[in-house]
Amino acid sequence: LPILASAVLCAGCQPASASVHYPGAIDACRLPGANLPAQLAAGTVEIPAASVKTADAKVVPEDQPGDGTEVTGCKRLFARDLGGGKANLQDYRLVTIAVVRFTDADSDQAATKASQLMTDALGDHSGVRLVTGVGDEAGFAEQWAAVRTGNVVLGVAIADGGTEAALIPAATLDNVQAAMTDMTSTLQRDFQG
């Protein structure tokens, strides 16, 4: 059975108003910092995302585009390092990032919808909680996290696959929180209106 844990990412840092707003499209691949591999995929070598056939990860509920939403995603694939940077393509970690942006012209309404997604789908009433889960079934494990800022819900899923994928160290809550904080900072710096 999955083991669930939660931690507060940034309690009190998100104002109740929609003062944070993202008016334009967001490139999810521009959000991760250079230290993402060290934070979320230690002991691996990054390889092209198409190198291994992997299952698609649903990062946050309702992460498909629809009326009033725009979704962008990014996949980063890491293979277990056999030593000296030699990748073992049999064991991998897939990091999938998704950005759900509510496009309502009324920024308060858009922020309310983003908050509602966090509340309804992720059980987070404040919109700033980091939720992670770990499961292991048939050689597959997954962790996930999500955070809301203004009219955007940012999510990440970390999925491991392969016969010896357990040899890739799992990302700790601190690692996941640091990666989410980095991505949120980039989002606010580069995409805020």
Please report, for each region that a protein language model flagged, where it lies by residue.
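C-terminal motif of bacterial Sec signal peptides marking the signal peptidase cleavage site
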Residues: L9-G12
